[in-house]
C-alpha cells in the first residue's frame, strides 16, 4: 500500500519471492487469508536453483530473465505440476525437469541452449502463477490484483 495508495481492499496479492509463493486474499488492511501457497520450493528459490544449473550468476531471477530474452519459450516442453489445493503451486518438479534436460544433453555430449531453456522455464513459472492468480480472482470476484516480491519484478509479467 505504501507505493500504491490507490490500491484499496478487497484485492488479491501474489507474493512471489525466494522465500514465499502465496496467493493472499486481502479483505481489509488487517484482515487477510492465504488462499494458496507453494507446497515445496518458492518461485524465487526455483529461479535461483535453475540459474545455478544453467551456469548463470546469482541472483537467479534477473539472470534467468536476461538469458531468456533471446530464447524461445516453446523450445522445451516442461511439465505443469499438479498439486492438492486449488490455488497451491509446486516448483520442485519443474526445477528437476530443467536439471534432467541439462543432464540429458551432457550425457549426449551436446550443448544445452541456455536462452531457450531459461525462456521455457520462465514462461512455465509465469504461466503457473498467472493461472492460479486468475482462477482465484474469478472464484473470489476480486477486481484488483497486485504482485509483490522479487519474482514480481520479472519482466515476463
Language-model segments: what does each one mean?
Residues 1-11:
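Conserved phosphate-binding catalytic cores of ATP/NTP-utilizing and phosphoryl-transfer enzymes
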